[in-house]
From Swiss-Prot:
Keywords: Cell membrane, Disulfide bond, G-protein coupled receptor, Glycoprotein, Membrane, Olfaction, Receptor, Sensory transduction, Transducer, Transmembrane, Transmembrane helix. It comes from Homo sapiens. One of its GO terms (cellular component) is plasma membrane. Residues 50-56, 120-143, 217-240, 293-313 are cytoplasmic. Belongs to the G-protein coupled receptor 1 family. It is a multi-pass membrane protein. This is Olfactory receptor 5H1. It is found in: Cell membrane. The chain crosses the membrane at residues 29-49, 57-77, 99-119, 144-164, 196-216, 241-261, 272-292. Pfam families: 7tm_4 (PF13853). Odorant receptor. Glycans are attached at N5. Residues 1-28, 78-98, 165-195, 262-271 are extracellular.
Length: 313
């Protein structure tokens, strides 16, 4: 009865890092620089792959889509966070909040599937090199990409549907850097236990599936590498695989902790720091880890750069 008589809230305050006003300008400048580098790096990678016909193969199609999704994740979260550093009003409407969460859920879930697909691609390329052209065709790659995006959309729709059942009447303070189902469920005056359960079941299943796929694929890859006789080749392959696994661990570690681990009833500072790994840091690092270490990408980028410099002069 109290819930029915209460005034329903339709606007929220995203606190973000605003509880430390003395850091407002330095944090704004830091995140702005990171965001600009992230967008330029990922869009630059997409342009290189798009322009060079030699890179129109599964490995680079997957890499280009990873760059697109990284730019998407960063653009979903960072602009609003930057605005909140400087704007007098930190409000976000309920509809805008739901749109931001929907975009975030699609992009993050799609990246989970993409990382698993990329690990499988590396497994086939290294463990079955002679069969690679027959197994990992462009047609199969495109189908896997479509499945990744469809999986992301369906997963987002599930949580968006359960988000619509929530009502808010007690507090409009969201202690987070973006609108997410868990912090919103914590301040809802509707019973949100089903929302937490859906997050655990669906988010947990997707993360476990993709992590297992990645670990199994790279385990076979590492065994295949150890059979090689070239010390230089082994060191290079270990370095590349290590960098990839480092990126994956930074991405999945916070995701598992937030969406699969037990949810604390009260918000704390960790709720804002951990999401920075998969919304800000990983989109910045992925172009470096997956591209600058790749000879074909760097050669194509150099050629494109030289061509544009000649045209400008």
């Amino acid at each position: 009865m109290e819930e029915e008589n209460a005034t329903l809230l339709t606007e929220f305050v995203l606190t973000g890092f605003l509880y430390q006003p003395q850091w407002k300008i330095p944090l704004f400048l830091a995140f702005l620089v990171i965001y600009l580098i992230t967008i330029m790096g990922n869009l630059g990678l997409i342009a290189v792959i798009w322009k060079d016909p030699h890179l129109h193969i599964p490995m680079y199609l997957l890499l280009g889509n990873l760059a697109f999704v990284d730019a998407w994740i960063s653009s979903t979260v960072t602009p609003k966070m930057l605005n909140n550093f400087l704007a007098k009003s930190k409000m976000i409407s309920l509809s805008e909040c739901k749109i931001q969460f929907f975009s975030f859920a699609i992009s993050v879930t799609t990246e989970c599937f993409l990382l698993a697909t990329m690990a499988y691609d590396r497994y086939v390329a290294i463990c079955k090199p002679l069969l690679y052209p027959a197994i990992m065709t462009n047609g199969l790659c495109i189908r896997l990409l479509i499945l990744s995006y469809v999986g992301g959309i369906l997963h987002a729709l599930i949580h968006e549907g359960f988000l619509f059942r929530l009502t808010f009447c007690n507090s409009n303070i969201v202690h987070h850097i973006y609108c997410d189902t868990i912090p919103l469920s914590k301040i809802s005056c509707t019973d949100s236990s089903i929302n937490f359960l859906m997050v655990f079941i669906f988010s947990g299943s997707i993360q476990v599936f993709s992590i297992v796929t990645i670990l199994v694929s790279y385990t076979f890859v590492l065994f295949a590498i150890l059979k090689k006789k070239s010390d230089k080749g082994v060191r290079k392959a270990f370095s590349t695989c290590g960098a990839h696994l480092f990126s994956v661990s930074l991405y999945y570690g916070p995701l598992l902790f937030i969406y699969v681990g037990p949810a604390s009833p009260q918000a704390d500072d960790q709720d804002m720091v951990e999401p920075l790994f998969y919304t800000v840091i990983i989109p910045l690092l992925n172009p470096i880890i997956y591209s600058l270490r790749n000879k074909q990408v760097t050669v194509s980028f150099t050629k494109m750069l030289k061509k544009h410099v000649k045209v400008s002069y």
